[in-house]
Amino acid sequence: MPMAPRVLLFCLLGLAVTEGHGLEAAVPIPGCHLHPFNVTVRSDRHGTCQGSHVAQACVGHCESSAFPSRYSVLVASGYRHNITSVSQCCTISSLKKVRVWLHCVGNQRGELEIFTARACQCDMCRLSRY
């Protein structure tokens, strides 16, 4: 192989590898992580007192899978449970209270405690009842 085509081939391979690393950086980090978000708290619908705070939420992706059920599961379910799925959800594993200072009409001040996430984990998915 002459020298010029060989150099061109290495340059193209280098470009392809470099481009691949750029794409990996755009993919979200796997797992379940704390994520900050702004919260505005009001004492009533009229906003007589209000304040803001950066609270923490749990955001991310956890593992899930589905596969054909074992024969024993098929028999036990009367051949109705033919797919077994396993999944976990990103959840708050511990909370903490934080104090939010409220600014009120007439230069008054107040305070209110709210909950924020302290730690996150991938755990069993549960139905929410809010």
Curated annotation (Swiss-Prot):
Q: Which residues form the signal peptide?
A: 1-22
Coiled-coil positions: none
Molecular function via GO: hormone activity; protein heterodimerization activity; thyrotropin-releasing hormone receptor binding
Disulfide connectivity for this sequence is: C32-C90, C49-C104, C58-C120, C62-C122
- Glycosylated residues, chain numbering: N38, N82
Keyword Zinc-finger listed? The answer is: no
- Main site of residence? secreted
Q: Which UniProt keywords apply?
A: Disulfide bond, Glycoprotein, Hormone, Secreted, Signal
GO CC annotations?
extracellular region; extracellular space
Locations listed in the record: Secreted
| Statement: the UniProt record of this protein carries the keyword Glycoprotein | yes
The alphabetized list of GO BP terms reads: adenylate cyclase-activating G protein-coupled receptor signaling pathway; cell surface receptor signaling pathway
What SUPFAM superfamilies has UniProt attached to this entry? Cystine-knot cytokines
Q: Which InterPro entries match?
A: Cys_knot_C, Cystine-knot_cytokine, Glyco_hormone, Glyco_Hormone_Alpha
**What does the sequence similarity comment in the record state about its family?**
Belongs to the glycoprotein hormones subunit alpha family.
> What job does the chain carry out?
Functions as a heterodimeric glycoprotein hormone with GPHB5 able to bind and activate the thyroid-stimulating hormone receptor (TSHR), leading to increased cAMP production. Plays a central role in controlling thyroid cell metabolism.
Q: How does it assemble?
A: Heterodimer with GPHB5; this heterodimer interacts with thyroid-stimulating hormone receptor (TSHR), and hence stimulates cAMP production.
**Full protein name:** Glycoprotein hormone alpha-2
